[in-house]
């Protein structure tokens, strides 16, 4: 199984890189880098988030979060907001301008993803999703050891 596992790893890695490179170009067209997009996307879908937890949720070092939040704040795409219950906690909140930008990005973003995945049938997409989820959860166990 080792040879087949290695081949699958290489195929997955190359597919991820190709998709990711293409999507990053799409994001750059809107004046964002992938990390900025990830932060805005998190806030857009999950609401206000403590700065301390954003890094964990998008897999970014805490020192980098401050830099990214500063950049997004300069672009007026998010604001910092003090916690009403804990003075030590600061939240990031997406602004109307940020929401508008993501509303502009998402339709094309989703269409690009659909186009790349269109080589698979609906059933294949479901099977692939389930299998990759199992592999990811299994890999996570090794990471947590």
From Swiss-Prot:
InterPro entries found in the cross-reference section: HTH_MarR-typ (IPR000835), Tscrpt_reg_MarR-type_CS (IPR023187), WH-like_DNA-bd_sf (IPR036388), WH_DNA-bd_sf (IPR036390)
Source domain of life: Bacteria
Induction field: Repressed by 2-methylhydroquinone (2-MHQ), diamide and catechol stress. Not subject to autorepression.
Membrane-spanning residues: none
Any one biological process term the GO annotation gives: regulation of DNA-templated transcription
Pfam family, one: MarR
Keywords linked to the UniProt accession: DNA-binding, Repressor, Transcription, Transcription regulation
Function in brief: Negatively regulates mhqA, mhqED, mhqNOP, and azoR2 which may contribute to the degradation of aromatic compounds.
PANTHER family: TRANSCRIPTIONAL REGULATOR, MARR (PTHR42756), TRANSCRIPTIONAL REPRESSOR OF EMRAB OPERON (PTHR42756:SF1)
Record-given protein name: HTH-type transcriptional regulator MhqR
Species name: Bacillus subtilis (strain 168)
High-level lineage: Bacteria, Bacillati, Bacillota, Bacilli, Bacillales
